[in-house]
Amino acid sequence: LPIHRFIAANNANDIFYEYLQTGKVDLILANFTVTDERAEEVDFALPYMNVALGVVSPDSNVIKSLDNWNSKDQMIVISGTTAETYLTQNYPDIPLQKYDSYATAKSAMENGGVAWANDNTEVIAFASQNPAYTVGIPSLGSQDTIAPAVSKGNETLLNAINDEIKALGKENFFHADYEATLVDTYGTDYEDSLVVEGGETSAQ
């Protein structure tokens, strides 16, 4: 699959949809969780990563449960993410402090935020890079997957990507890639729980 050009995109659903639907890009490779709602807008290929939600908080007040949440505290989330949806549906009494990007949410956490709910990959990485924080809840809600996305109905590209993912799985490519690029970010303890090899996962 020759890639001619990479285009940076903010991690926001509407941007992903727009870029695919207008033909600005043919393929989205991002921290884009597969959901039924999103599958109405795009076609997802086979997954390459497992993901759940997680919650990170300061070491001075590690949040290990969302039960008995202090109603005066706000949970940081990024607008349009599965974290926002999950908390709105399952913990409607938790006030949400919403931001439009990872950078602004990260800044809010670093500047006195009580807790931040996001994909567990994101909060694990944040805590590993910021020693004063702990992932008190490493898995919240159901386990989902992250997968490439193409515009709705682009079966030719979708099939080509799926074939490539299956072929790479036979080489153990995704584990090797994790070890080469992500161990410093997530650590070895999370490798087998995060990596999906050859598109095969029970979370599909």
Please provide the spans of the model-predicted regions.
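Extracytoplasmic
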Residues: 22-23, 39, 43, 50-52, ...
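Flexible hinge/capping segments at coil-to-helix
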Residues: 48, 57-74
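Periplasmic-binding protein-like
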Residues: 49-59, 124-166, 184-203
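Extracytoplasmic small-molecule ligand-binding "clamshell" domains
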Residues: 1-31, 98
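A ligand-binding cleft/hinge motif common to bilobed small-molecule-binding domains
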Residues: 14, 21, 30-41, 89, ...
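Ligand-binding cleft/hinge of the Venus flytrap
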Residues: 1-6, 82-101, 128-129, 180
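Extended ligand-binding regions for polar small-molecule ligands
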Residues: 1, 60-63, 73, 79-82, ...
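Hydrophobic residues within well-ordered alpha-helices
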Residues: 19-21, 69, 108-110, 148, ...
